[in-house]
Amino acid sequence: ADGILPCGFIYSNPAHLSVLEYRRQKINEAKAYMDLMNGEALVLKYADGELPNNDEVKKEVAEIIVKYKPDLIVTHWHSSMHKDHNNTHYIVQDAQFIAGVIGNKEGIRHYAPVYFCENWEDDNDFDPYIYVDITKGFDLWSKALHTQWFVMNSKDFAYYDYYTSLARCRGALSGKRYAQCFNVLKHHKKEVKDEL
């Protein structure tokens, strides 16, 4: 799990906590999750439902891409129900372009391909195109999920059960014990072979 850098653009606000209290909790949860994954967590300043899809955010994310030089970028598929996920989908693609073609403030560039993760809130038109075997890391990932309050305590959706069960189902479909699925943009969905 070396080199994992989740970048949370927003923080949510459940009824029993103030926005500021939950922001602190989410930052601590992100750190706990990434400590287990041997990574670093970044959380930007935007509140739940308030992530703007604008040039300022795109440039901020592009700066992060250039600074950390990821091998690949995983982000949200476009969403039919979550405004922030939908904005993130487009922000990251534009930030990838800025980072790879224009570069940061110093003109330094970095390109990394973008993959879209499977998420129940973003499943409209999601095509599980790439199956990745996560069997070796499943126990660690499962343990890391326990650091996320909403995953373990939501009264609205059984996140933990859903994602661990989905990993098993995707594993069965791919001949593995556990797997996670990713999508790519349509123009990346091609195979080039010398013969069939």
At which residue positions do the language-model features occur?
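Active-site rim/loop-helix segments in enzyme catalytic domains that contact anionic ligands
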Residues: 1-68, 195
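Metal-dependent de-N-acetylase/amidase catalytic core
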Residues: 18, 35, 52-196
